[in-house]
């Protein structure tokens, strides 16, 4: 089944309450609380909703923002962006291209070589270390 065709009920049944709030309701993890914020294992980060590969460990960096930050996705085609004008300010929302789940936001204040900071909610992610053991 195409994840974009899942019903809200199906999402609610298949996700943890935290992941459902972030991915389907566009929520936000409280700053500094996510399990991947201070996380430095070698591996890859996947969408918690559908398993789409999103980020590699070697693009993660400490931004001081309170959320896991990456300077680029594995493939641009694995994410989508759209304008978000909630909270009375203009931002760029980052979505999983496979399931449409809300991941976080991207800002233009990141490190070289991209100058981008993908600020991603831990609850929207699933980590697998290099040996493919799920964490």
PLM feature segments, named:
Residues 2-135:
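A short Gly-Trp-Pro
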């Amino acid at each position: 089944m195409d994840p974009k065709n899942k019903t809200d009920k199906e999402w609610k049944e298949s996700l943890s309450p935290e992941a459902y709030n972030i991915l389907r309701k566009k929520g936000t993890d409280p700053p500094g609380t996510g399990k991947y914020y201070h996380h430095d294992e070698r591996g890859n980060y996947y969408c918690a909703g559908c398993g789409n590969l999103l980020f590699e460990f070697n693009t993660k960096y400490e931004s001081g923002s309170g959320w896991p930050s990456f300077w680029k996705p594995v493939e641009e085609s694995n994410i989508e962006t759209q304008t978000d004008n909630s909270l009375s300010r203009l931002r760029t929302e980052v979505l999983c291209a496979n399931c449409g789940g809300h991941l976080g936001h991207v800002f233009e204040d990141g490190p070289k070589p991209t100058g981008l900071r993908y600020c991603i909610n831990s609850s929207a992610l699933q980590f697998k270390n290099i040996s493919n053991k799920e964490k």
